[in-house]
Amino acid sequence: MAEAAAPGTTATTSGAAAAAAVAAASPTLTPTVASQSPAAGGGGGGSGGGWTKQVTCRYFMHGVCKKGNNCRYSHDLSTSQSAMVCRYYQRGCCAYGDRCRYEHTKPLKREEVTAANLAAKSDLPASSSLPALVEPLAEVSTGEAESVNSNFAAAGAGGEDWVNAIEFVPGQPYCGRAAPSCTEAPLQGMVIEEELEKQQTNVEMKKQLCPYAAVGECRYGENCVYLHGDACDMCGLQVLHPVDAAQRSQHIKSCIEAHEKDMELSFAVQRSKDMVCGICMEVVYEKANPSERRFGILSNCNHTYCLKCIRKWRSAKQFESKIIKSCPECRITSNFVIPSEYWVEEKEEKQKLIQKYKEAMSNKPCRYFDEGRGSCPFGGNCFYKHAYPDGRREEPQRQKVGTSNRYRAQRRNRFWELIEERESSNPFDNDEDEVVTFELGEMLLMLLAAGGDDDLTDPEDEWDLFHDELEDYYDLDL
C-alpha cells in the first residue's frame, strides 16, 4: 500500500485521486466504487435504469419515438411526470379534457413556487453522494482518510446551512454565504414584491371596462373577462376604473358638468311654467297646441309673449313701423324677436340667446344669394350664409371711398321716394316685386357704407332694424 501511494501522493492529494488510488490498491472495494459510478455519472445508454428513466420521452408523448423499447427515457405516462404543461388548460379552455397528452396542472402561486424551489435544492447530489464515498474510504487508511476528509471538508464548507442560502436573483447584488448576517436580503425581497405589484397594476390598467356592467346588465358576473368598474356616486353606473385615477377623475368631472346642465334646465323649466302671454293672456306651457308653447323674447324688454302672438303683432300693416316694432306694454322698440323654449330674463342670458340665434341663422343658406347665382340686397350683413357650391364663403365687398356728399344725397332722396311709394301702393301688384326689393336693399347698403358726418346710422342694432322691417313688410324669408 505504501509503494502504491508513495510515488504520486502528497499531503495535498485531491479527493478524486485518493479514491482512485485506494480503488487500485484494494480489490475488495472495487465493485463498490464501480457500482456507484454509473449512478453518479448518469448511467449508460440502452434500456438500463438511471435518472433518465424518470424523465418522460418527449418524442413518445407526440407518438414519434423511433427507438421504442430501447429508448433510455421513460415511456410510461402513468408513473413518470410530464414536463409539458398544457397552457390551454391553465387558461381554462382545453378542448381535449382528459384525453389531452399534456399535463393538466394549475399555475402555482408565489408561495408554492418558493417551496418547490427549496424542495428541488434539497435533492442536490452533493450532500448525499459525497458522504457516501467518504465512509468506505475512511476504513482503508487513517492518514489518507484524514487528507481526504480534510479536502472534502474544505470543499464543502458551509454545507450544513445551505438551506438558508440566499437565492440568486439576476440584476441584484449577491450577498455570499453569510445569509443570516446579510441585511440586504429583506430589501431585495421588498423590491421584487414592489416590481410584481407594479406589473400587476399595469396589467389591470390595460384591461377594458365591461360595457355591459357599465349599464348593470353583465350576465357573466365575476367570470367576465373584462373589468367591472366601481359605481359612480353621480350617475350610479359601474364606469369608474379601479386603478386608472385619470379615468376616474375625468368621468367624475364630466358627470358634474352634466349635473350642472340638468340643474340649469330644471331651473329654466321652473321659471317658465307659470309665465302668461301679455297678448292672449294664456299660460304659454298650457296651450293646447304643443308647437305654440314657445316664447318670443324681445331684445330690449322683459315682457312675456308667446312666439305666435308677438309675431302676429309685429306683422300688422295698419300701423307705423315704430309702433309695431315696440313692445305692446312698455313701447320700447326691440329689433329682435328670438324664439325660445324657455323664458329668459337676465341680460347675460339674453345676450347668449341672441348670439346663439345669430349663429344658427348663419348656418342656413341665403335663398337670395342662391350659392352665387343670385344677389342678396343685404350683402355681407345678411344673417344667412353666403356660400358657393364648393363651400367658399363670399368675400365682403369693400366700401366705396371718395363718394361725394351730393351723390349720397341723391341716393338718400331716391331711397325715401321708394319708401313713400311703398306706403302709397302695394309693390306686389306687378311682376317687379323682386326688382323693387333688390333696389331698395342696394340703396340701403349704399347709405350705410357711404360714411361721412351725415350718415344715417352706424350702430348694428339700426341695421338689424332695417333688415327686420324689410323681412316683415314684404313677407320675405331672408
Curated annotation (Swiss-Prot):
Keyword Aminoacyl-tRNA synthetase tagged: no
Enzyme class of the recorded protein, top EC level: transferase
Signal sequence bounds: none
UniProt-annotated stretches for the region Makorin-type Cys-His: 232-259
Entry's Gene Ontology molecular function annotations: ubiquitin protein ligase activity; zinc ion binding
Pathways per UniProt: Protein modification; protein ubiquitination
Zinc finger extent (C3H1-type): 51-78, 80-107, 204-231, 360-389
Assigned EC number: 2.3.2.27
Zinc finger (RING-type): 277-331
Gene Ontology biological process: protein polyubiquitination
Keywords of the record: Metal-binding, Repeat, Transferase, Ubl conjugation, Ubl conjugation pathway, Zinc, Zinc-finger
Post-translational modification: Auto-ubiquitinated; which leads to proteasomal degradation.
Keyword GTP-binding carried by entry: no
Catalytic activity: S-ubiquitinyl-[E2 ubiquitin-conjugating enzyme]-L-cysteine + [acceptor protein]-L-lysine = [E2 ubiquitin-conjugating enzyme]-L-cysteine + N(6)-ubiquitinyl-[acceptor protein]-L-lysine
Known role: E3 ubiquitin ligase catalyzing the covalent attachment of ubiquitin moieties onto substrate proteins. These substrates include FILIP1, p53/TP53, CDKN1A and TERT. Keeps cells alive by suppressing p53/TP53 under normal conditions, but stimulates apoptosis by repressing CDKN1A under stress conditions. Acts as a negative regulator of telomerase. Has negative and positive effects on RNA polymerase II-dependent transcription.
Self-association state and partner proteins as the record states: Interacts with p53/TP53 and CDKN1A. Interacts with TERT, modulating telomere length homeostasis.
Name of the protein described by the UniProt record: E3 ubiquitin-protein ligase makorin-1
